[in-house]
Curated annotation (Swiss-Prot):
Belongs to the ABC transporter superfamily. It catalyses: ATP + H2O = ADP + phosphate + H(+). Residues 4-229 form the ABC transporter domain. Part of the ABC transporter FtsEX involved in cellular division. Has ATPase activity. Essential for cell division and viability. This is Cell division ATP-binding protein FtsE. SMART domains: AAA (SM00382). ATP binds at residues 37-44.
Amino acid sequence: MSIIEMRDVVKKYDNGTTALRGVSVSVQPGEFAYIVGPSGAGKSTFIRSLYREVKIDKGSLSVAGFNLVKIKKKDVPLLRRSVGVVFQDYKLLPKKTVYENIAYAMEVIGENRRNIKRRVMEVLDLVGLKHKVRSFPNELSGGEQQRIAIARAIVNNPKVLIADEPTGNLDPDNSWEIMNLLERINLQGTTILMATHNSQIVNTLRHRVIAIENGRVVRDESKGEYGYDD
């Protein structure tokens, strides 16, 4: 059974822009897929629809067992336990420590303190930053901040991880570190969808490639190439 099932999805914005034009995509549990395409093609809308940041206008969409067309507002937090999100600009809370940033994702769903401490230290170990547990975001490099953002995104053991340009603000060395981390997370069974403009990553670490242009899926290939000029 697909963990993401999108059928004939249409999204129009109030300014008249049609961002998605009849998009259909099926993703199986444990897949790693890149979302590629030129700027303004609809990638962001596609990604944001998967965690209900954007509500679609037509079609059907289910993610991790949730029907995103019929989902009630009160159930959106439940969806977001099953779908972790990593952003290009990290979105860490500047006045909270590394520990507090990650723990917050568990506190909001009512986890007890013992489980929070155990799990936060587990994910910090996974991302290689246990020694930064008491640091604040402004004391970290960009690569370290993104690793903490990934730790926060996976702390609740989501079935799906959405990564929106996760290497976009990073130098090549840090970009490869982030990709190696995402590969390890994927090998543990987490489904990953990653929007990117980085041709070198896509062409080197081969996975499924879903290309979007003008709001439509124009290419969907197993172990595909990037296919655009940077």
